[in-house]
Swiss-Prot record:
Described purpose of this protein according to its UniProt entry: Mediates an active uptake of hexoses, probably by sugar/hydrogen symport.
Protein family according to the UniProt entry: Belongs to the major facilitator superfamily. Sugar transporter (TC 2.A.1.1) family.
Gene from which the chain derives: STP14
Transmembrane residue ranges: 26-46, 84-104, 121-141, 144-164, 171-191, 205-225, 286-308, 315-337, 352-372, 382-402, 428-448, 454-474
This protein's name: Sugar transport protein 14
Organism for this UniProt entry: Arabidopsis thaliana
Keyword field: Membrane, Sugar transport, Symport, Transmembrane, Transmembrane helix, Transport
Length: 504
């Protein structure tokens, strides 16, 4: 046995013996577990709205506020070009990046539930500090605590959902994380729209309300069951079997339980999971799951739209309230897309959705870039009719992303890793994701200022590259039991060279 996967055809044949029924216990566990996405989503949605509020800018960034009020023609794309302002957004993701390594240890030793609880406490503290902030240092400190919370939550929640779900509906269940993320973004935008009208402390309310999902997640986490996979990994076999019976709704769980035990036995033989992740036999998981997909998910440019939608729409000539309304519409489209993806992932497959959406997103980014090149900048005012067309195009882009790269960027990596490298692999996934999230957050506004419309064409080129990556390197994982995904590499034109003969 290698890679913690089943090493013979008997393992693959055993998958058809798995049984499950949807129980209230299973539904409760998935709903509470997926709430980790609401933390991530609320922050994604609230940051851009707050940084576009005049009261927030006057208190912490008076220079940007004055420049914004002057309506200088040369600052059409550059109104918000300030590295400290972008650090307010990106500091959270740099903190999350660093925290993922501690989160990997907690997730492996104390379970997925332990990381969920730690993440909710840290996120709560960050929300309190940000709401009470008196200076930029307090803002950044609060963001660091929020980042630690997101690092732990993003480490544990996708694993939790993948391990709790039966193979046949794993795609749908795992995408609860994306759905709650999208709902968090939408709620944050609706709150920003209301709090912008509360002077001069509305921004404090927006930031402080981050404590609400943190409290709900903590309270739910106290009664949340640990995953059978994690319990087996900790040597609690009887408890693991009891939980598996409850979440599957049947006593006939011996085949699945045996697979979990065998995978755990292989995992225990691995003393250093991070070093094992670099082993030749794990090269497909490393390249695709740990690095490629999480990096490309951010390089679509989607999070730039989520971070800075209100700021971007204001830069394109929309008023303050109009920009918040436009970004709210955009994020409502993201929620619709997340619901669509819950149905389509297990019906059409992960690979098809990624490829189809890449074509769509490429086209939308090109059209937006060319439109802005011809009609905006250098003192030109953007016609309202054209502005509405841009909002529609961005909504279509969001719909494509929200049913593909958004959920698949978390779902597919969580499916690929064998048990002995799963917590380490997910740690690298979150680390890479947050690194590129922070990089994009820190660089987007300055890139918008210097590249102007070219930033959208740059994202179009990146999307073309990531579509090619999926086409050539990613096999379909739809309805494959999570402990048997490893067997797919043996049938792939490239990856079979890395995994063949490792079990002999």
């Amino acid at each position: 046995m290698a890679g913690g996967a089943l090493t013979d055809e008997g393992g693959l044949k055993r998958a058809h013996l798995y049984e499950h029924r949807i129980t209230s216990y299973f539904i409760f566990a998935c709903i509470v577990g997926s709430m980790g996405g609401s933390l991530f989503g609320y922050d994604l949605g609230v940051s851009g709205g707050v940084t576009s509020m005049d009261d927030f800018l006057k208190e912490f960034f008076p220079g940007i506020y004055k420049r914004k009020q002057m309506h200088l023609n040369e600052t059409d794309y550059c109104k918000y070009d300030n590295q400290i302002l972008t650090l307010f957004t990106s500091s959270l993701y740099f903190a999350g990046l660093i925290s993922t390594f501690g989160a990997s240890y907690v997730t492996r030793i104390y379970g997925r539930r332990g990381s969920i609880l730690v993440g909710s406490v840290s996120f709560f503290l960050g929300g309190v500090i940000n709401a009470a902030a008196k200076n930029i240092l307090m803002l950044i400190l609060g963001r660091i605590f929020l980042g630690i919370g997101i690092g732990f939550g993003n480490q544990a929640v996708p694993l939790y959902l993948s391990e709790m779900a039966p193979a046949k509906i794993r795609g749908t269940v795992n995408q609860l994380f994306q759905l709650t993320t999208c709902i968090g973004i939408l709620v944050a935008n609706l709150i920003n729209y209301k709090t912008e009208q509360i002077h001069p402390w509305g921004w404090r309310l927006s930031l402080g309300l981050a404590t609400v999902p943190a409290i709900l997640m903590f309270l739910g986490g106290l009664v949340l069951p640990e995953t059978p996979n994690s319990l087996v990994e900790q040597g609690k076999l009887e408890k693991a079997k009891a939980v598996l019976i409850k979440v599957r709704g049947t006593n006939n769980i011996e085949a699945e339980f045996q697979d979990l035990v065998e995978a755990s036995d292989a995992a225990r033989a691995v003393k250093n999971p991070f070093r094992n992740l670099l082993a030749r036999r794990n090269r497909p998981q490393l390249v695709i799951g740990a690095i490629g997909l999480p990096a490309f998910q951010q390089l679509t440019g989607m999070n730039s739209i989520l971070f800075y939608a209100p700021v971007m729409f204001q830069s394109l000539g929309f008023g303050g309230s109009a920009s918040l309304i436009s970004s709210t519409i955009t994020n409502a489209a993201l929620v619709v897309a997340a619901i669509m993806s819950m149905y389509s992932a297990d019906k059409f497959g992960r690979r098809f959705l990624l490829l189809e959406a890449s074509v769509e997103m490429f086209c939308y980014m090109v059209v937006v870039g060319v439109t802005l090149a011809l009609k905006f900048g250098e003192g030109k005012e953007l016609p309202k009719s054209l502005g509405l067309i841009l909002v529609v195009l961005i909504c279509l882009f969001v719909l494509a992303y929200g049913r593909s790269w958004g959920p698949m960027g978390w779902l597919v990596p969580s499916e690929l890793f064998p048990l002995e490298t799963r917590s380490a692999g997910q740690s690298v996934v979150v680390c890479v994701n947050l690194f590129f999230t922070a990089l994009i957050a820190q660089c987007f506004l300055v890139s918008l200022c210097h590249l102007k419309y070219g930033i959208f064409l740059l994202f179009a080129g990146l999307i073309l590259g990531m579509g090619s990556f999926v086409y050539f390197l990613l096999p379909e994982t739809k309805q494959v039991p999570i402990e048997e995904v490893y067997l797919l590499w043996r049938q792939h034109w490239l990856w079979k060279k890395y995994v063949e003969d490792v079990d002999e």
